Amino acid sequence: MFACKAHQNLTHILKMKDAESFTELFLKSLEPLRVSRRLGPVLFQFGPTFKIDLERLDAYLPLLPNDIRFAFEFRHASWLTDAVYERLAARNMALCLAESDKLEVPKVMTANFGYFRLRKGDYSEEGRREIADRVRALLDGGRDAYVYFKHEDDPRGALWAEELRQAVLQPPPMQP
């Protein structure tokens, strides 16, 4: 399965405005993965200076097909509103549950799958356990989870991902 990121032209230049033809071209590029059932979620990650524009969001979302999973990462806090969550939920599109040292998105589920981007510089053992509990709860509820750790400077992200994989495969410890 391949998770893809929407082209920067859509997220940082056009910012969903007048983007019909480029969106169509981008989606066409995903077609081989889609028809082979190897396409995972597609992430739209918007720049940190892009402020909320509900009219633009309302015009753009219908351009995206229902048979592909989409996640939206809004890095400007103005987007973190019930109005945005409702629009995403109405189309079964995920709010990317992103964490960084600069911004933490509320843990609002808007789709039948979870999409996590965990980009803090460090995660304690307790923090990683909490992440595993959240992911396990999604899986136990019949939802899929896509989880990505920061992977730039050292191997910790990959090690944490493997630790998470092992943790969710094992049953949770019994409570006393």
Predicted regions and their residues:
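Residues lining hydrophobic/aromatic ligand-binding pockets adjacent to catalytic sites
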Residues: 1-176
